[in-house]
């Protein structure tokens, strides 16, 4: 099992690899007050003005079972699909168009992360 420091370092590296310039932020998470998934995955603070979490803050939140997320920087796209079958369909469509993305499974379905780099006027195949 990874130590807290290794886990946090790996998490921060992965966030910056997938979403360069993103900030790690605290999410509401499930609780007695937040039983609805869309509320649980929303940020606690106004993430646009709040500073991102430090490594030690991330470690404490993870240890306590809190949820964390990341802001989406310019050039980044996240497709959040709360149905696993629909997520697989969208992933297949992106693959067919030669869009490369990183996928993660979530409680309700999944998220697809894409970085847009100078696409120009790319035409989609029909």
Swiss-Prot record:
Induction text: Encoded in an operon with groES, groEL, ydiN, ydiO and ydiP. This operon is heat-inducible.
UniProt note: phenotype after gene disruption: No BsuMI restriction or methylation-related phenotype.
Protein name stated in the entry: Uncharacterized protein YdiM
Species per Swiss-Prot/TrEMBL record: Bacillus subtilis (strain 168)
Gene this chain is encoded by: ydiM
């Amino acid at each position: 099992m990874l130590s807290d420091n290794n886990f946090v370092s790996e998490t921060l590296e992965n966030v910056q690899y997938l979403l360069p310039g993103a900030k790690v932020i605290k999410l509401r998470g499930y609780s007695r007050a937040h039983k609805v998934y869309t509320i649980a995955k929303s940020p606690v603070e106004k993430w646009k003005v709040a500073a991102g979490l430090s490594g030690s803050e991330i470690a404490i939140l993870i240890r306590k079972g809190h949820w964390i997320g990341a802001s989406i920087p310019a050039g980044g796209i996240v497709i959040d699909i709360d149905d696993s079958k629909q997520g697989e369909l969208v992933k297949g469509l992106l693959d067919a168009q030669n869009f490369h993305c990183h996928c993660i499974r979530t409680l309700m379905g999944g998220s697809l992360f894409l970085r847009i780099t100078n696409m120009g006027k790319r035409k989609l195949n029909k």
